[in-house]
């Protein structure tokens, strides 16, 4: 089976491996559930916790020197991502956006919740292109 886009899986695996030591910031509970579904086992932190982004960023930077940022891909998610990048960077926090950037550049999904579906779709297309059915 040849994947149309093996880089999606490579980057997912790399992010999941990093997540064993580096927390991932996501917008909400459904995003946490989606990442758990595709094998993320590390610390996943919900952004929407009833505090301002300024206070949230300060709390994160106090506790972590590196983070992976994985907000939704819609306008609101992009706005949150941009704001947190500015805030966290100002506190000296290193931000990894590799997985987010790749998905946003190559796929038309709107939320982190869609990532398991996207990965299944890419796998399914690879299987179907080889004449196999599942």
Summary of predicted features, one role per range:
Residues 34-38, 43, 47-134:
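TOPRIM fold recognition
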Residues 28-29, 50:
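Alpha-helix N-cap/helix-start capping motif
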Residues 1-23, 29, 56:
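Phosphate-handling DNA/RNA-contact segment within nucleic-acid enzymes
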Residues 24-25, 78:
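Short alpha-helix boundary/capping motifs
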């Amino acid at each position: 089976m040849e994947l149309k886009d093996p880089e999606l899986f490579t980057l997912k695996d790399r992010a999941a491996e990093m997540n064993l030591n580096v927390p991932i910031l996501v917008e909400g509970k459904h995003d946490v559930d989606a990442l758990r579904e595709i094998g993320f086992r590390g610390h996943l932190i919900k952004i929407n916790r009833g505090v301002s982004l300024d206070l949230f960023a300060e709390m994160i930077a106090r506790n972590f020197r590196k983070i992976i940022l994985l907000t939704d891909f819609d306008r609101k998610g992009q706005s949150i991502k941009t704001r947190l990048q500015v805030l966290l960077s100002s506190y000296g926090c290193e931000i990894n956006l590799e997985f987010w950037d790749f998905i946003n550049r190559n796929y038309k999904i709107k939320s982190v919740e869609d990532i398991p579906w996207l990965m299944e779709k890419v796998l399914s297309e690879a299987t179907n292109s080889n004449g196999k059915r599942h």
